[in-house]
Curated annotation (Swiss-Prot):
This protein is able to protect a cell, which harbors the plasmid ColE7 encoding colicin E7, against colicin E7, it binds specifically to the DNase-type colicin and inhibits its bactericidal activity. Dimeric ImmE7 may possess a RNase activity that cleaves its own mRNA at a specific site and thus autoregulates translational expression of the downstream ceiE7 gene as well as degradation of the upstream ceaE7 mRNA. It comes from Escherichia coli. Keywords: Bacteriocin immunity, Plasmid. GO terms for biological process: bacteriocin immunity. It comes from the Bacteria. InterPro entries: Colicin_E_sf, Colicin_pyocin. This is Colicin-E7 immunity protein. The keyword Transmembrane helix does not apply. GO terms for molecular function: toxic substance binding. Belongs to the colicins ColE2/ColE8/ColE9 and pyocins S1/S2 family. The keyword Translocase does not apply. It holds the Pfam family Colicin_Pyocin.
Length: 87
């Protein structure tokens, strides 16, 4: 999977794919790829909860990739940050 420079370079569907790739790497034999993906996730989302969005979701949120995207989208909009690429 190609990692993009900014969250604005991802469509929502592409970001869901990134989250699914993270899920897949969670069960890999090593964490080498997972570490890179998680660092990228934290960097481009800029969300203060970081990887807790994935591993420790709030009780009132869907913990699916789509639920994570929804929370990121809402937080970025509320904080005046650019959103996902339209596509």
């Amino acid at each position: 999977m190609e990692l993009k420079n900014s969250i604005s370079d991802y469509t929502e569907a592409e970001f869901v794919q990134l989250l699914k790739e993270i899920e897949k790497e969670n069960v890999a034999a090593t964490d080498d790829v997972l570490d890179v993906l998680l660092e990228h996730f934290v960097k481009i989302t800029e969300h203060p909860d970081g990887t807790d969005l994935i591993y420790y979701p709030s009780d009132n949120r869907d913990d699916s990739p789509e639920g994570i995207v929804k929370e990121i989208k809402e937080w970025r909009a509320a904080n005046g940050k650019p959103g996902f690429k339209q596509g």
